[in-house]
Curated annotation (Swiss-Prot):
This is 6-carboxyhexanoate--CoA ligase. It catalyses: heptanedioate + ATP + CoA = 6-carboxyhexanoyl-CoA + AMP + diphosphate. NCBIfam families: PRK01322.1 (NF002360). It is an enzyme of class 6 (ligase). Homodimer. InterPro entries: BioW (IPR005499). Pathway: Metabolic intermediate metabolism; pimeloyl-CoA biosynthesis; pimeloyl-CoA from pimelate: step 1/1. The keyword Phosphoprotein does not apply. The gene is bioW.
């Protein structure tokens, strides 16, 4: 198995990213797909694109995918409150999402105080070394949803994670999500105005979390997210 990662940017501003874990015979088509995504993206033409291929030498940890909860009227305030995220923490998370900084990874906040707990600046924390497998083989989830569900499932695979809020920084995509192990994966429609680059990924955690261990899991442990529709 091989890890394939792509990152593209323009003048050091993030444009696009993608990654997966695949068999050797899928490398060529995966690289072509990531190349097309990186160079022909609505966020603009990159002046830098990097594709990294690395053989996986460690055992791959299986993670059960969160269930997708279909609810057109999902309310972010109610969802976060149900998961133990305070209004203060949510407001602080939205401040990060709406500011002008384009973060390339997630920001980790206290679910109680909203204080930022990681120290990675604009880079943030990157959930990497993962793949997604739909064991139903129905193909009813598009690539955007499978990528988001895979990341959300990895991020929430820890007992001290209360939930994750994600808003895409793509110009015309206005649907975000809130996900947690407790309540599943909820899409949030029209969470931002169209034609805006603001967005981000916020992880709300219990202050007792072993941050170094958690970050190592997200960034270094090979993971396969297995999805089964119930």
């Amino acid at each position: 198995m091989y890890s394939i990662k792509m990152r593209s940017s323009n003048q050091d501003v993030h444009i696009s990213g993608a990654e997966t874990i695949c068999e050797f015979d899928k490398i060529e088509q995966t690289v072509q797909r990531f190349y097309n995504k990186g160079f022909f993206h609505e966020n603009g033409q990159p002046d830098f694109l990097n594709i990294k291929i690395q053989k996986i030498m460690e055992p791959i940890q299986q993670i059960k995918a969160l269930q997708i909860i279909e609810d057109d009227k999902a309310n972010l305030q109610h969802l976060t409150q149900e998961c133990g995220v305070t209004e203060q923490a949510l407001n602080q998370g939205m401040t990060y999402i709406k500011n002008e900084t384009v973060y390339t990874g997630a920001i980790i906040l206290s679910a109680i105080s909203g204080k930022r707990l990681d120290s990675f600046g604009q880079r943030g924390i990157r959930a990497t070394h993962f793949s997604f497998e739909d064991i139903n083989n129905k193909g009813d989830l598009n690539e955007r949803v499978t990528d988001a569900l895979a990341i959300a499932s990895c991020i929430n695979a820890h007992p001290y994670v209360k939930g994750e809020l994600c808003v895409s920084d793509d110009l015309t995509y206005t649907t975000g999500y809130f996900a947690s192990a407790k309540i599943g994966y909820h899409r949030l429609f029209d969470i931002k105005p169209v034609n805006t680059r603001y967005g981000g990924r916020i992880i709300f955690v219990d202050d007792r979390i072993d941050l170094n261990h958690y970050i190592s899991f997200l960034e270094s442990t090979p993971k396969q997210v297995v999805y089964e529709r119930v």
